Amino acid sequence: FSALGKHKQALMEVVSANDLRILSYGVDPNYGPDDIDLIDQLKYQLMNANMEQNGTLGKWMMRNTTSVQINYDIASEKDMEDMTFVADCLQPVSAYLFANSPFQFGKSTGNQNLRNVIWENTDNHRCRNLIDHDINSQEGLIDRYIEYIMTVPGIFELNETGMIVDTNQTLGERLINLETKGELR
């Protein structure tokens, strides 16, 4: 908890020095995506264009939501598969507990879990749960997930010089091309 305490102390110093408040919301309570500038980097521009084609609320996700991230400590491949599957099955409960999105444009969202609605309609290739992507049990989860992500169209990649460029090539296609050229390390 020492690291957490240091992080919180640093955060509170910035908040205090800048007369800010911490709000525990999963979605910006007052503004829509058209009110918030997109981060001015090519990868975000490419993601934005992709999400406008592959979901209805990608702009909202990129500009108005916060993320919930969980780290696990694992001891084995089986441990990882079991924990990942159980955590994914518990995702709806976690979304309900931590999404905290009671307002949109300053008005009550009622019983709607707005943050979860946004993420469910962001990008069907990359979002949702494992079962939505035909991974229905923990047995062989890692291999089945790898098989799945090898078929997902890319958004951007690093070219030979390390620059971000757009792509719709899948990771599987990219790896085959690199192997064919003898460039796969």
Give residue spans per PLM region:
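Membrane helical hairpin/interfacial module
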Residues: F1-M12, A17
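Loop-rich catalytic cores of soluble enzymes, especially ATP-dependent carboxylate-amine ligases
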Residues: E13-A17, R21-R185
